[in-house]
Every structure is written in structure tokens, then in C-alpha cells.
Amino acid sequence: MKVVVAIDSFKGSLTSIEAGMAAKEGILKAHPDANVVVKPLADGGEGTTDALIAGLGGERIDLTVTGPLGTPVNAHYGYLAEKNTAILEMAAAAGIILVRESEKNPLTVTTYGVGEMIADAMERGIRNFIIGIGGSATNDGGIGMLKALGYQFSNENGQDVGEGGQALERVSSIIIEKANPILKECSFHIACDVTNPLCGKNGATYIYGPQKGVTPEIAEELDQAMNHYASVTSKFLHNDYASAEGAGAAGGLGFAFLSYLNATLTPGIDLILNAVELEKELEDTDITVTGEGRLDHQTAMGKAPVGVARLAKKYGSKVVAFAGSVTPEATACNAAGIDAFFPIVRGITTLAEAMDPKNAKSNMTTAVEQVFRLL
């Protein structure tokens, strides 16, 4: 019997690989001769870098970059030598987790550090990039990232436009020739789960700006500035991605990747499943095991476990999911490809006890073993 295990992290408790290995232990207790393959799982958001480093034997590269507030922050990215690929999370350099509530200012926060991470990887000879752009603190249209990669943005007096959302309305000319020439050798694959355009009522500023400090008083001004930036970009680069799906992601960072770096934007789970080559293992599997910390109605709407299930169903595999907790609405997961799901917690316990890594591993192993005794 072949079993493929791909479980998302139990945030604050188990990493993807830790959860997967605990499940593998349970399977082998029930079926010692089973062929169990454990794959890392993530959705392109928080934890993706670490999951792929651990699951694919990657290297962690630590560095100091410019944070969203313009001050140095410690960041890291992953390097997969066999694929000559870097795994980055923009939030490591420009994430909202790096900004206190009182410090949120869409006019000044910058994505410059994201560009520094990419530049560092290019200097090391890396040419392929998988980048998650969730959790941003920024609304600068990606202009900070692009400046770190060599692009020059000037105002009507030929001066640098500065940083943050306030820089967008000042853009008068773009010197494309100053961009790092190595960029032409690179491919960028962006994990993006939003479809918003760059501007307008459904764009970056109006939809995602409020959580980053955009007030009603400055929303219209910022949106107009973003539209101006898009127009100048179109003039100098001879393309137009302002209305493209995902252009409004991460405060317009999606637009920057599309317009300047010829990137592809792909739903996070699809991009990660391809990166870990999960489908190849599912072609001849008998049972697929997946899961996450909490199974609920959101899981059924396309989160990582359902992404695994849909892929497994292409090859007729049974799919079993395990979770720390399961809500009544999780029954929607059955129609989404998960044949059966089970909570791993045994008995009444506190949240802290349930999330303790030692307890979570033990609970996972026991729950999986008992289910697999029926299979």
C-alpha cells in the first residue's frame, strides 16, 4: 500500500513536516510494510519558505534588509540547489507583522527590502524565484522593490521620487536601462490568491488599504496616485497590467511583478503543489493523507488540504484529513474531495495543551494509526 502524506502546518504547534512525520509513524504502526511518502505543504503564505526548506532539503539564507519603515530587519529566504530556485516571502522584508499599529503609514512604508532579497539571491547565481506576497504592510505599487533592483523613478525635476505610497504621484519618468541586467535571466512565479485589479473601488487601496492604515481621507488620493503610476509605467514599458487579476495584491506589488519582471501570478496552493512535485507521487498512490490545524468552511473554499484532495482525485485516490479541530461546517470538505476527516484531539483539554508540540505529535500519530487499522 502506498500512502502520500501532505499536511499543512498546525500554526503555533507543528510544522508541515513535523505533522507529516507524526502521521507517517501512525500509518507504519498499523501497516509496517506501507510505502509512505511525506511531502511538505503550504499555501504560499506564512511558513511557506520554512516548509519547503525542510521538506525539499533546502538551505536557509539569512540576511539583513531594509524593513517597511526604512530601518534594518533580519530576514531569510530558502535556496533549493537542485532547482536553482529561491523561495521568498515578501512579508519577511515588508510584512505587516513588522509594523506596530501606531506605525502603519501607507504613505511611507516601502517594499525596498523585497528587492534587496531578490538582489541578494541573484548575486548568488539564483535565477528562479517562487515568491509569496501575502501579509504586506505596504501600498507602494512595488516601487520600493523595483528601486532596489535598479529601476530609477524620477519626478518632473529629475529627482528621486522617494519611498512609499506618497512617491507614486511624483513619478514622471522611469529609467529602465538602470535595472539590474541579470533580471532578464530570471523567472518569477508569484503565489497570489487575490484577483483584485490595481486601482478603483476593488483595487489595492480601497480593499486592502484600511488594514494598512489607509483612512477614508487619503484613500481617493492614494488610489489616484496609484493610477498615475500605472499610466506612467504603461507609457515607458509599453504594457498595461493595471486591470489584470492580482495586480492589486500586496499593495500593488502584483502589478510591479507583472509589469516590470514578466512574472506569472498563480494561486498559492497550485504553485506550491507544483514546486514539491506532489502530482508525480499521487499517480500511483492508494491513500492520500492531508490536513491542517483547523478544518472549517474556509478549508472547503480552496485551502491547502482541498488543493491536495482535488489533485489526488485525478488519480482515484481516497483522501483522509486530520485536524486539530473540526467545525460543523467542515462537512463541506466532503464535497470538495476529502472522503473523511478526523480531529486528532482526544478528550477535553485546554488549547495550550492541545497545541503543545509533544502532545500534538502524539495525538496525530494515535489518530492516524487508529484510522489506518480500518484500511
Please annotate each region the language model reported.
Residues 2-133, 137-375:
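N-terminal loops that bind phosphate or other acidic moieties
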